[in-house]
Amino acid sequence: MKKLVAYITSAYPEKSFSIDLALALGDNGVDTLELGVPFSDPVADGPLIEKANHKSLEFGFKFKHLLEISEAVAPKVDTLWMGYFNSFYQQDMSKLIPLASKIGVNGLIIPDLPHEEALTYSDLFKENSLSNISFVAPTDSEERIKKVISDSQKFIYMVAYAGITGSGQAEDLQPFLSSIKKYSDTPVYVGFGVSAKTAKDKVKGADGVIVGSAFIDILLKDNLTYAQKIKQCSELAQIL
């Protein structure tokens, strides 16, 4: 059975909604929740997630909201934080990582933290039983792939398309996937460039799929009530 990771932007449109949505997703087939930390310049994300980031910040998102959502959700749904390094660095990594572990968060996904710099924090993550998810991209050399995944934890984040999230580009990922699996037994999840339409094709041979923009697209629809948004996201989770 393939694993499903769902990304949602924290506290968009508000904290209590994020908690209700996260728990509903957990009840409807989502194995892992990726709680996005709103950031003003989310360079790796597509227009939908960027818009949700900006709206959450406009609505007054504070880092404490992420902590409060996580405290409510992490005991019930496997939870990761996804955010840009500056968001975490400003909280003091030496204090934040132990706090995340105490809350029950199981790992961080930091797309703009290069592997070489992430090594600075490897002991901190290990001491607190927290995973720092490794990224590999189709543009990486075989040598770099070997280096990056040598210390991979929980799962390897395989970038489906060397661009921005949610692009839904169609391409053959099997050779790239095979090259990763040659060097590691760590599960490989496909993300970045996965849309609702391409999820089933792109997950072939992988151990899981990460979907964000398809859920955010629903959340951005102003004509839907909160209950309708949760219902549609839950239905999407069931068919992915």
Where are these regions (language model features)?
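Glycine-rich phosphate-binding active-site loops on the catalytic face of alpha/beta enzymes
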Residues: 32-42, 103-109, 113-117, 157-166, ...
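Hydrophobic faces of well-ordered beta-strands that scaffold small-molecule active sites
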Residues: 4-8, 33-35, 79-83, 108-110, ...
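N-terminal amphipathic alpha-helix/helix-capping segment at the start of soluble metabolic enzymes
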Residues: 1-9, 69-71
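Glycine-rich beta-to-alpha transition loops that act as phosphate-gripper elements at the mouths
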Residues: 9-14, 82-90, 114, 136-139, ...
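Catalytic cores of alpha/beta
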Residues: 15-25, 140-151, 190, 194-209
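Conserved, mostly hydrophobic/aromatic
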Residues: 6, 25, 36, 100, ...
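Active-site-adjacent beta->alpha loops and helix N-cap segments on the catalytic face
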Residues: 15, 39-51, 57-69, 88-94, ...
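Histidine/lysine/aspartate-rich catalytic loop segments that bind and position anionic ligands
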Residues: 130-167
